[in-house]
Amino acid sequence: YLAGALGEGVSGKYDQNPLYRFDYFDCETYVDTVMALVLAKNLTDFRSKINQIRYKQANVNFTQRNHFPSADWIPNNKKNGFIRELTYFIAGQKTKVSRAQINRRSWYHYLTADRIQIAYLTPQEKESRLTQLKSEGETLYFSKKVSIAYIPVFELLRNPKLRQKIPSGSLIFFVGHDTYLTSRIGTPMNVLHMGFAIWNKGQLYCRMASSKAKRVLDVRFQDYLKTYLPLGTLDGISVWAIQA
């Protein structure tokens, strides 16, 4: 596991972590990589696909990266034709909608020097580059109202037939709210985590890159949902299919 495992490569202005890799992931870059492998016909196509998945219109630039799942990643990849929503199909009238105001300008303002992933820069040079990034981001972006449909946690825990409708290999977005996270990054988020639904021997698992376990692992789906119950931060899940 490595937070922010991918960047814009050696020509990146702010983040020169590789455009793709297979040794380290965070939750999003794991999904990015697996999805690109599913969609690609060969290595050249993989390189193209991962840029299409990670950046708006495949424009490899920090400010064009799909930083926010509900504001960027999902709508841009839906537009690409790479994903299709299953949430309503699975849950029907049990489906709820989460809304949030993503404050991009504030998010850029809260960025710290560790976002500048260029090994040869001195600490002072990183601070200077961070100032450039904040200025660029704050000029480009304003707040955006976003919404995402989800299946409530309590419905998933009490209704095994509902869980059985989730196809193996589906994308799972964990929808919720976290005031502590908001205070750290400068904006509310209504998608807290992402991974894949995997069926194995009649059991449903979530396959994900875990910051706690520091690796990619399978966690029994119900057990993972229950870990959020004492925190009260998880509302439910949004389910999407990869359109290979």
Which residue stretches match the model-derived regions?
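Acidic/His-rich structured neighborhood in mature extracellular/periplasmic domains
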Residues: 2-151, 167, 176-178, 191, ...
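Generic hydrophobic, helix-prone segments enriched in Leu/Val/Ile
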Residues: 50, 73, 156-157, 166, ...
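Short, flexible coil/linker segments at or flanking structured domains
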Residues: 10, 56, 160-162, 185, ...
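Short amphipathic alpha-helical surface micro-motifs
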Residues: 50-51, 153-157, 178, 218-222
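Short alpha-helix capping/helix-loop boundary micro-motifs
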Residues: 148-163, 182-184
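C-terminal soluble interaction/assembly domains
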Residues: 172-244
